[in-house]
Amino acid sequence: MNILLTNDDGIEAEGINTLAELLSKYHDVIMVAPENQRSASSHSITIYEPIIVKQVKKPYNIEAYSISGTPADCVRVALDKLVPDNIDMVISGINKGLNIGNDILYSGTVSAAIEGAMYKVPSMAVSAQFIKNKKENYKIAAKYALRMLNRLKKEDLKNDVVLNLNIPFCSEEEIKGIKVCKVGNKIFNTRFSEEIDEEGNKVLKLEGDINKDIYEGTDVYYIRNKYVTLTPLHYDLTNFNILEETEQLFLS
């Protein structure tokens, strides 16, 4: 397959380069990624500033470009200007940290994949759980991404669906399997700590602890139980459950 590879951690991040090195052995890969760390940029795009594109050399034989914009910019610029028309799939990752539960709404990784789907290119986001002060398991995550990719044939790919793949932090032997599941609730209970600086201004820092109230059958639940999770996402945010009710309420 012809694959466009991007991320939100930046073009020099270990995750995207681990994935590129493995995928390029079996597929044609073009990397277009932010020049710097752009985590939690969600689906933001650059409007008021020019976007700078630089060609980057990689140790493995792939075409690579850094972009001064956001992850969503990377996909937009790539599909409009940099890559051929025959891209079969956009893959975003491997992200340093999970993208499950409500966190997907903040994720630049997931949003880059969604941008691909908005361009009618099938897409997948790949994220690996990160534990502070421990070595990331990008090689395991890359293996699972390749496994998912190899299960697909071009005719199987739906161009409006984003596959969200998350890999727990554990050894390959400890992984219990793969679960196709729905999005869960929030991972963390977040809050802001407050300090006062020398000039009397409030200084707020985001803090939080793990949310223990999780729902069975969700990505959050299965990740905590050492399963790889795969969730199909869609960019249509319509709440169909109350569409008719809303019409009756406001138009009747």
Swiss-Prot record:
This is 5'-nucleotidase SurE. It catalyses: a ribonucleoside 5'-phosphate + H2O = a ribonucleoside + phosphate. GO terms for cellular component: cytoplasm. Belongs to the SurE nucleotidase family. It is found in: Cytoplasm. Its cofactor is a divalent metal cation. It is an enzyme of class 3 (hydrolase). Keywords: Cytoplasm, Hydrolase, Metal-binding, Nucleotide-binding. Nucleotidase that shows phosphatase activity on nucleoside 5'-monophosphates. The keyword Nucleotide-binding applies. HAMAP family: SurE (MF_00060). Pfam families: SurE. It comes from the Bacteria. Its EC number is 3.1.3.5.
